[in-house]
Amino acid sequence: MKTFVNIFLGFFIFESVGAVPITDTVTYDSEFYDVSLGELPHPFVSAENDQSDQVETEIGTAIPSIIQESYSSAPLTEEPEEEASTPKLIDGSSAQGSGVLVPQTQDGLPTCLLCTCLGTTVYCDDRELDAVPPLPKNTMYFYSRYNRIRKINKNDFANLNNLKRIDLTANLISEIHEDAFRRLPQLLELVLRDNRIRQLPELPSTLTLIDISNNRLGRKGIRNEAFKDLHELQHLYITDNNLDHVPLPLPESLQALHLQNNNIQEMHEDTFCKMRDFSYVRRALEDIRLDGNPINLSKTPYAYMCLPRLPVGNLI
């Protein structure tokens, strides 16, 4: 009996399994990677279905949403590439411009392209310039050495209220306007050596250093009391000129006076000291150079009594 039952159950299970419909499964194929989802074959679509249009509509609306969740990814967003930062030239003619590139030379070039501008310093050395170029208003230090500048005009340094140093070494300067430097409120150092200057103009009282060596200054080249009101002056260099006297009076602040290689022939006892005040000591003036002049310093010993050091020069 048990054998009959087992045979019956086995036959029933075999028939049930054979009755289950076999369906094709959809597997991922790289060929369909670039095909739109709407073109993929759907397992439930029958070629013999009379309502194919309706089925295609349902496939295009409902089914792809499921497939998209499995295979599609969020669209890639390209991050904007950072452009390389390039220094921009500021047009000083605009309201926001700093004025650095506004001044132009006679050739029509901005000064800071012809010369070298580093911060508030302008270097125009050895540029074959025949005139002082227009300078940015914030210029503090100006160097124009080894050029061909012949004349300093009244307005060459006009409105440069921050200018502290001017160096015009080794040019061909023979003429300087009387007011070329006088109105510079912060000028500290003026270097005019190795030129052809015959007359020293009026100078601002703020100067601490003056170098007019190797020029053509004679008896009338420096006016009387030219340095009297320069109360901050510390260094005065007038070597290699044609002076026949020491320019007086000299400010009390003076520390170094170089007058080598001139034509100074005499020295007064009150040139450096106060003959009526034997207690007077001129402590600041420690460096006096008179060598290269036709003068015998030993003839005027009382002229140096107030000095901390004797001048350098001929004693015979």
Curated annotation (Swiss-Prot):
Q: Does the keyword Repeat apply?
A: yes
Q: Which keywords does the record carry?
A: Disulfide bond, Extracellular matrix, Glycoprotein, Leucine-rich repeat, Proteoglycan, Repeat, Secreted, Signal
LRR repeat residue intervals:
138-159, 162-183, 186-207, 232-252, 253-274, 284-304
* PTM field: The O-linked glycosaminoglycan chain(s) are dermatan sulfate.
The disulfides recorded in the entry are 112-124, 273-306
Q: Where in the cell is it found?
A: Secreted, Extracellular space, Extracellular matrix
Keyword Metal-binding tagged: no
Q: Which Pfam families match?
A: LRR_1 (PF00560), LRR_8 (PF13855), LRRNT (PF01462)
Q: Which domain of life is it from?
A: Eukaryota
- Annotated LRRNT domain residues: 100-137
**Record's InterPro entries?**
Leu-rich_rpt, Leu-rich_rpt_typical-subtyp, LRR_dom_sf, LRRNT, Mimecan/Epiphycan/Opticin
Q: Give an example GO cellular component term for this record.
A: extracellular region
Q: Where would I find glycosylation on this chain? A: 98, 296
Region forming the signal peptide: 1-23
UniProt-listed GO biological process terms: articular cartilage development; bone development
The principal location of this protein is: secreted
- What tissues contain this protein? Preferentially expressed in flattened chondrocytes of developing chick limb cartilage. Also found in the cartilage peripheral zone bordering with bone marrow cavity.
Protein function: May have a role in bone formation and also in establishing the ordered structure of cartilage through matrix organization.
Member of which family? Belongs to the small leucine-rich proteoglycan (SLRP) family. SLRP class III subfamily.
Which protein is depicted?
A: Epiphycan
Classification from the root reads: Eukaryota, Metazoa, Chordata, Craniata, Vertebrata
